From Swiss-Prot:
Protein name, UniProt field: Large ribosomal subunit protein bL17
GO MF terms held by the record: structural constituent of ribosome
Disulfide bonds: none
HAMAP family noted in UniProt: Ribosomal_bL17 (MF_01368)
Superkingdom to which the source organism belongs: Bacteria
Organism: Rhizobium rhizogenes (strain K84 / ATCC BAA-868)
Keywords on record: Ribonucleoprotein, Ribosomal protein
Length: 140
């Protein structure tokens, strides 16, 4: 029986889950929006929300705790400088999960995880080029 067992295994070992969530958290903080499967999205939300709360604390110990979880000092710097100040007055609820249909290959449920008041310019040059190409195709 699995009474009281919280969290999903996602067909991965504990070390693989830990590494995957660290990478997903870093990507989410960097780009402020990611597309993933719905179960992974539901698992990553509390992890990143706790990281944002660490960023709002802002002290050295909180920064070291965030670095130990994400393992990327540049991402942690963005978390503590940009994201934590943006959500200084908000008490939780920093992320939103929106269902995004099903994946073509295996029909897995997809979801978009994004920050509530996200910076739309954080997606990067590759995404801007893709959006511009889509707008050109739609206009033509």
């Amino acid at each position: 029986m699995r009474h009281g067992k919280a969290g999903r295994k996602l067909n991965r070992t504990a070390s693989h889950r830990k590494a995957m969530f660290a990478n997903m958290a870093a990507s989410l903080i960097t780009h402020e929006q990611i597309v993933t499967t719905l179960p992974k999205a539901k698992e990553i939300r509390p992890i990143v929300e706790k990281l944002v709360t660490l960023g709002k604390r802002g002290d050295l110990h909180a920064r070291r705790q965030a670095i130990s979880q994400i393992r990327d000092a540049v991402v942690v710097a963005k978390l503590f400088d940009a994201i934590a100040t943006r959500y200084a007055t908000r008490n939780g609820g920093y992320l939103r999960i929106m269902k995004a249909g099903f994946r073509q290959g295996d029909n897995a449920a997809l979801a978009v995880v994004e920050f509530v008041d996200r910076d739309t310019s954080a997606k990067g040059a590759a995404d801007k080029a893709r959006v511009a190409a889509e707008e050109e195709a739609a206009a033509a």
